[in-house]
Amino acid sequence: MKIAIVTGASSGMGREFVRQLGYFYKNLDEIWVIARRKERLEALVKESRVPLRIFAGDLQKKKVYKELRDALEKEQPDLRMLVNSAGFGKSGSVEEILSEKFRIQTDMVDVNCRSLTRMTLLCLPFLRAGSRIVNLASASAFCPQPYFSVYAATKSYVLSFSRSLGEELRKKGIVVTAVCPGPVDTEFFKFSGKPQNILKKLTMAKADRVVHQALKDCRSGKSVSVYGIPMKLTYFGTKLLPHGFLVRMQQI
């Protein structure tokens, strides 16, 4: 049985990956979807070209991993793609967020880094030559971001982990792609807060276009997927310009 697994599938980028995977893989038997909101996953069944298997649960808790592990060991599927899309951010200074709710920033590290790593390790034995791992990073991974400090740091981890893991798995024919979009018009900003930076407002992208580009890039074997000219310029700019200068420029 050929499957794909998508975390964070109930909304935003994860939901869009589920919608488009049926076009990317013509012969998928199932997509296994993971998120906390079961009712959203059930509604997604009508939007997918491929049958869905629902795993409703919190990636910060052990239960969903056990359910997934049991299903993988029972079915022994050919896992064609793992999409690690679960994650969240919160804007504001470290001190401001700390005063609002102590655990938000450590939860961010748990979900964006620890859960992504745990999902990857759990799924690795079921990947074969031609399989893909797509990890949702962010353009914030390219450079430190004041007032988005913890989120940007977690996405730097995702980018670094993805690129190094991709090199390790290259000889097995497994591609790992880090998706690094700028601001995307999703529910993400309902929790994180609306972007205040003018450039971020002007470069807001649509989720379907970002996901379409990501799937094209992973099919081409690219280690990093960056959507849109502004973010590509940002990507190359962070390689050429001092990060101290870029950090200060973000405050304009």
Model-derived regions, located:
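Conserved glycine-rich cofactor-binding loop
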Residues: S10-S11
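Residue(s) in the substrate-gating loop at a strand-loop-helix junction
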Residues: S138
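Rossmann-fold cofactor-recognition segment
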Residues: S48-K63
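Active-site helix of classical SDR
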Residues: T120, T154
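C-terminal helical subdomain
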Residues: A178, I198-Y235
